[in-house]
Amino acid sequence: MSRTWRALVAVLTLLLLTGCSAAADALRPDPTWMPQPEGPPPADLPQPPSTEGAPSPGAPGQPGGPEAGTADDPNVVAIGLTLPWGLAVLPDGTALVGERTTGRLLIVQPERAPAKPVMRIPGLDGTGDGGLLGLALSPNYDDDGLVYAYMTTRTDNRVVRFALRGAVTPVLTGIPKGRTGNGGRIAFGSDGMLYVGTGDAGKPALSADRKSLAGKVLRVDTFGRPDRNNPDRSSPVYSLGHGRLAGLCLSGVNQVYTTEPGQGGQDEVNRVEAGRDYGWPGGTRAGAAAPDREIPAAVGGLSGCAIIERGLFVTSTTGRRLYALPLDGSGQPGSPADYLVGAYGRLRTVVAAPDGALWLTTSNKDGAGKPTPQDDRVIRIMPPAGSTNSPA
């Protein structure tokens, strides 16, 4: 973060604190809020999230402006895609988006324009909930131009890497696959290690099996070798007891968060610690960690997650909304506020860009949604005011 941005955030935070009767109001949902389009920021001046309290006339969902989610909504930057799942923001401000079942990778502009196909991943099995899943840029992308992807093949789930339009090279193979529970989120931490979220492959008992790569968070280097700081330095397993793991993201201090279905009709947000067991299946094993935050599955279907400042953003498929959870000084997630309820249908992925924008994908053509003629879509918004600051 630049010094200019830090100064702006400090001033704006002070204004928010002095203008509110209670610090907890910082994340209270504003029923009038709808996303406002923001163009790409200047390359030499990163811009913080907007602090305007309400949209101006003419913004989506306001009098005189287009309704959010309609053909005229300027926050929708790409349309007509087939189950966009993985997304990574490139250094030039565009986004690389992967289609789960087709294996296509496309470049999406930060303003409405046709998505440009660049390559197709070979050897893909897109049946069930498998296919081309998470994407992440190499920590040395400016030098090596490598993209990492989690994919399902006929025999396994695996992590691969490639340069755009280049050959695909396996990095980590042998992750169990299934009709469901393929997992598939990946992210690099500030330690340069690759964190891989895997599902239980439809076999819940694998999640508790320390010898299986299913139902785990894995931590490996850029070549797929176990991090020597893992609980077992010979194993890629970082944590276990995860079920149909749907989201994985990291904070700037390398705190790992996951989102996943839980027990008893609740979805979970977990703050993951090395070596911990997160209880799937059953949640009653001795020593199993309790969820850090639960959200009823009826308005959950939690999927991707992303972090900006002190706000944790989580997409919801079943609930068709975006959740924002404040993070306190220890990284503990607080009570969720919900946004974009029903505006774009089932939301699958959310990624935070360096300019403070959130990129999201919809999943309305997966058989469980109600697709519009524009689906599936990629959306780019600025977070609502106050959602990136934790209450004092």
Protein language model regions, located:
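Sec-dependent N-terminal signal peptides
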Residues: 8-14
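C-terminal motif of bacterial Sec signal peptides marking the signal peptidase cleavage site
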Residues: 16-19
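Flexible glycine/proline-enriched surface loops and loop-helix/loop-strand junctions
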Residues: 199-203, 230-233
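Surface-exposed loop and turn segments in beta-propeller and other repeat-based domains
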Residues: 116-128, 168-182, 220-240, 274-298, ...
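Repeat-solenoid scaffold signature
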Residues: 237-264
